[in-house]
Swiss-Prot record:
The lineage of its organism: Bacteria, Bacillati, Actinomycetota, Actinomycetes, Micromonosporales. This is Proteasome subunit beta. One of its GO terms (biological process) is modification-dependent protein catabolic process. Its EC number is 3.4.25.1. Belongs to the peptidase T1B family. It comes from the Bacteria. It catalyses: Cleavage of peptide bonds with very broad specificity. PROSITE patterns: PROTEASOME_BETA_2. GO terms for cellular component: cytoplasm; proteasome core complex, beta-subunit complex. NCBIfam families: 20S_bact_beta. It is an enzyme of class 3 (hydrolase).
Amino acid sequence: MAAAFDPSGRLPDLFTSAGTSSFSAFLSMAAPELLPGRRPLPPGTAADLTPHATTIVAIAAAGGVVMAGDRRATMGNLIAQRDIEKVYPADAYSLVGMAGAAGIGIELIRLFQVELEHYEKIEGAMLSLDGKANRLAAMVRGNLGAAMQGLAVVPMFAGFDLAANDPVKAGRIFSFDVTGGPYEETGYDAVGSGSLFAKSALKKRFRVGLSVDDAMRLAVEALYDAADDDTATGGPDLTRRIYPVVMTVTAEGTHRLTEAETAAIAENVVAGRMENPGG
């Protein structure tokens, strides 16, 4: 139940009492209508009313994880946006990407970022990587009603595990289903409409112990292959200079490649495909 309005201007007791370290749990008591998936929807499907985002790939490398996403959003058979961003830092040592209903997905990611920051401020420490994945799973589960009407969001989460015994193997990847089930993946994963083709490419080229640089190129290669067969996935657009978003997370934290760095990788991939279209 939402907090009652006080005509005196005082904050409701809910805002001044000791509460939970979960911001989304607080919001569910203070203003539940603001949570993704909590707004009432009319009967029927709404899948064609919003842009949908795909495809995201993640690759475990020596000492971290690489996550990359294409830039295309579609509405049915139309390209709704050519330069949407689908990969973001969740906090200092983790990344999150999303596929599905773009508006809800971006809102979910922003709420997740606030959730992790709120926990750290209240508890004075970071959540464990498993704890972060479980918090994200709960948020995805909260959107199940909207997902049943076509507005599904499926995130991908990856991070550097500060508690790992071996820093070289500290990069971990988590996938989720539409009901919020979290699953840890080994080596690599992909999500979105082009994920079938991206994972097929990763399966052939992935090797345990890849360097971060090699994993970045492999991620762009996988997105190129996905775009080659999936109309909802956009490949490197050399004409408009629109390239995939590529991010890394290592012991030094998260890092987003600059446009120039991503352009260099994408142009090398395209040049290689000119000589060998099949990769």
